[in-house]
């Protein structure tokens, strides 16, 4: 009798390559898939396959992104690589590809360049928690002292943006040599070393189900004799019958109790991350809950009106504005399930923001929204998306 295939279920981690144009991000991505496939199975992808990144849409924005996957000794990785700088900016701000860690590719021949800095800043702003560095093109540098200088420069740059520069793993190698099958330290060995660094330096991400319960409110119904039912998709955590719940955002926070969980018209004892459920709330009136609020574990999330954000403004070609905007611009900010009007303050010295720009701004909303750092939103004018953003820091 034939043995069935043994499938080991490895923990899953999301990563991606970032860094300056032409420093070798796509070549490195190809090298990783090629070399790890030989060792752990999977599918190798060539440079051309990765480079012809398909278009996808996130929050009304078109982004070109390549997705590859590979396995290491301990894990399964999903890895994103983008063809152009603008795609990285859009990807990181919309959270289209959430990264548990990033591989920063820096050419040893050139050292850190403007986009190196910009991608590190973006990673900090959008909450990419870990960066590992691959110093590429080491075959083009004969001078060991030069390599050391570039390494010091990279560590300093990381520290400037609050990453632990001194403790960051920096792997020196040549993605091209590795792709060509070079067996030296800078060839295949460097890729395997990078894989080990991914496994050991990036901790296993918390699964959505293990976090504190939160569910954005999509709809509210009143069922005679039963009370108020709130429907939505559980974003994080678990809700059980009998749990205390807070209703947060738009109005003063209210405490209530979950007296029932329904899914597909069946009663359950709990709902968990990813489930579309109806939650029955004890003693809550229909008019006390509305779309745009969240149900959450008490004390786990607070409502805020003022925050700093990293935003990307759609270009005219992407269907965005045709003209720049200025300080005091008042669009709608679409958080989870609803729009809230807010005004934008620009950084000192910035007069206006052009379509196609990305920039750090401060936002003041007219009504509070339940938020944490890292929450994504769309910027809209009359229902049309004109930008995307991510909460960098909550102020009040």
From Swiss-Prot:
Catalytic activity: GTP + H2O = GDP + phosphate + H(+)
Span list, region G4: 136-139
GO cellular component annotations of the record: cytosol
Region described as G1: spans on this chain: 19-26
Binding, GTP: 19-26, 81-85, 136-139
Subcellular location per the Swiss-Prot or TrEMBL entry: Cytoplasm
Sorted UniProt keywords: Cytoplasm, Elongation factor, GTP-binding, Hydrolase, Magnesium, Metal-binding, Nucleotide-binding, Protein biosynthesis
EC number(s) per entry: 3.6.5.3
One MF annotation (Gene Ontology) recorded for this entry: guanosine tetraphosphate binding
UniProt-annotated binding residues for Mg(2+): 26
InterPro entries: EF-Tu_GTP-bd (IPR041709), EF-Tu_GTPase (IPR050055), EFTu-like_2 (IPR004161), EFTU_2 (IPR033720), G_TR_CS (IPR031157), P-loop_NTPase (IPR027417), Small_GTP-bd (IPR005225), T_Tr_GTP-bd_dom (IPR000795)
Ranges of residues in domain tr-type G: 10-206
Keyword Protease in record: no
Region (G5): 174-176
Residue ranges of the region described as G2: 60-64
UniProt-annotated stretches for the region G3: 81-84
Function text: GTP hydrolase that promotes the GTP-dependent binding of aminoacyl-tRNA to the A-site of ribosomes during protein biosynthesis.
PANTHER family according to UniProt: ELONGATION FACTOR TU, MITOCHONDRIAL, ELONGATION FACTOR TU-RELATED
Similarity field: Belongs to the TRAFAC class translation factor GTPase superfamily. Classic translation factor GTPase family. EF-Tu/EF-1A subfamily.
Quaternary assembly: Monomer.
Protein name according to UniProt: Elongation factor Tu
């Amino acid at each position: 009798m034939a043995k069935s295939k043994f499938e080991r279920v490895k923990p899953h981690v999301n990563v991606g390559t970032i860094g300056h144009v032409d420093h070798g991000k796509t070549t490195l991505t190809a090298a990783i898939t090629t070399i790890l496939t030989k060792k752990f199975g999977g599918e190798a992808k060539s440079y051309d396959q990765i480079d012809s990144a398909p278009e996808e849409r996130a929050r009304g924005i078109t982004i070109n992104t390549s997705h590859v996957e590979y396995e290491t000794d301990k894990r399964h990785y999903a890895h994103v690589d983008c063809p152009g700088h603008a795609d990285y900016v859009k990807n990181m701000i919309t959270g289209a590809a959430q990264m548990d860690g990033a591989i920063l590719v820096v050419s040893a021949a050139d050292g850190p360049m403007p986009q190196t800095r910009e991608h590190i800043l973006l990673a900090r702003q959008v909450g990419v928690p870990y960066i590992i560095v691959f110093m590429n093109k080491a075959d083009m540098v004969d001078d060991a002292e030069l390599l050391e200088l570039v390494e010091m420069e990279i560590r300093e740059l990381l520290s400037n943006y609050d990453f632990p520069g001194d403790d960051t793993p920096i792997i020196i190698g040549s993605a091209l040599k590795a792709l060509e099958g070079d067996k030296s330290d800078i060839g295949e060995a460097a890729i395997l070393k990078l894989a080990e660094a991914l496994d050991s330096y990036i901790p296993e991400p918390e699964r959505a189900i293990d976090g504190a319960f939160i569910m954005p409110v999509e709809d509210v119904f009143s069922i005679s004799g039963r009370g108020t039912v709130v429907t939505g998709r559980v974003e994080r955590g678990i809700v059980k019958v009998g749990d205390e719940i807070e209703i947060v955002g738009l109005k003063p926070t209210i405490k209530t109790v979950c007296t029932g969980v329904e899914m597909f018209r069946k009663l359950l004892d709990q709902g968990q991350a990813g489930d579309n459920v109806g939650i029955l709330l004890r003693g809550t009136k229909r008019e006390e809950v509305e779309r745009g609020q969240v149900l959450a574990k008490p004390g786990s999330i607070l409502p805020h009106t003022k925050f700093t954000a990293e935003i990307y403004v759609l270009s005219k070609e992407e269907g965005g504005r045709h003209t720049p905007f200025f300080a005091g611009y008042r669009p709608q900010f679409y958080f989870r399930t609803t729009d809230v009007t807010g005004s934008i303050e620009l950084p000192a010295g910035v007069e206006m923001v052009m379509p196609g720009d990305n920039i750090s701004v401060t936002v003041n909303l007219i009504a509070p929204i339940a938020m944490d750092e890292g929450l994504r939103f769309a910027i809209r004018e009359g229902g049309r998306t004109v930008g995307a953003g991510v909460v960098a820091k909550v102020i009040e």
